[in-house]
């Protein structure tokens, strides 16, 4: 019987209690845009409906910014029907939005004909500069792995097509029809703006039309949301009116000017009152301090806010689907600590023996495919065993595990406390040995803080939730050397099954950026081969080491169903984390 104190180094699970892996920064194959001037990338000879920068170039619109954040090729984000493209030999892009488009023209650009036509109120109004078949014309199909981005509705109001609640509801339904057409053509992920409050724009603020237009904007959005909820696709609504109202209520938090009329003034002075301080001819020209460039279009500040808002929603699953993985990491760390304890010498038959209290502390950093994070973990394991006879030893163990994970580019912070209990059995006869454990526990996600960029500052949304975990694991091995030998070498096979469930929760702020998440469940089924060895290095010291290779059979992509807490009836499911089939040492597994 071995009675020497033990030193054990397990290569297969080093730092397992704190490591994490990250999903790719974009699961989308591309980005295709439809809409009006709010998203127009330059159909009219490169003109965009936002401010000029310091070099005299047009600032990007929100889908161009979002596409860059998602890693989409800039060429693909360009205009689809610009008359300059064929003249200059430039390829058409995937942005089909055209300034002046009504909801009917947006639908036509998808299903029949895309026209770059001079909008009403402009010189040459009605002249078609270029036309081409619509995106899905001639039987073409949408890309189910691409992100589709849809804006529209404002021009139905500006061009006099909406004069009553019935007109507003019909316009909202027409915009939803564009999303429906994309879904029927094969699109799966469709992001749709809610119409901004037209009463809160320089064009109508302070006029008799302000209140009626605010009410009609709301009717439009109610109709739009109702119709979107009936489409069999992942429809991602953007609550743009709520976001902009937050910016107007607390401008300094968004980098906007304080003490200025952000609704009644604009940057360019084109048709509206130019801001005397930050307008283009003001004392300190700076479009980033203003929300509007002209009567109805946002500056780069507004475009950036909306792009960041959209990205915060799309990127949330890449972090939140790691919550079950944190629990699986705790389970594996607990199982490894049990195996560590099982290397201690067996006590006499009919007697008990406490486990050696263990409280390791570890750190690890990872960086994958543009996402990075740092994890750290602490745990405490206690318990004891009882030897039934020469061949069997039984025991109980409990463990408390605390993990903190910082994820993403803005250091989101997630904390998990795991409370695990195990019953285990060990067997040895001649040179054969085996062990098995059944584990169950409670998961306390006490502090979940998702942090993301929103304009010039970061914003955090907080929540908490609970969960449960259980697992069964076993090993069977054979010692190649006699028990009395100074060295041991034992090949083994292993099998593990674990299941984690994380309860759904809502982030608590009630703001436009707050999200709600449904329950998540993640199962792990692993088989492994390994080699365990030990050597007596000193009379009182034996060194243990282990190497193992496992295969994960549950390697499907992890998705999460979510919703904006401000729009709870419109949920959608987005892509998150994908486990490795063969976890790296020190990781629960993850591949970009």
Curated annotation (Swiss-Prot):
Domain of life per record: Bacteria
One Pfam family in the UniProt entry: Autotransporter
CC annotations in GO: outer membrane
Signal as UniProt keyword: yes
Stretches the record annotates as Disordered: 572-592
Residues at the catalytic site: 37 (nucleophile), 294, 297
Family indicated by similarity: Belongs to the 'GDSL' lipolytic enzyme family.
Protein name as annotated: Uncharacterized protein in trpE-trpG intergenic region
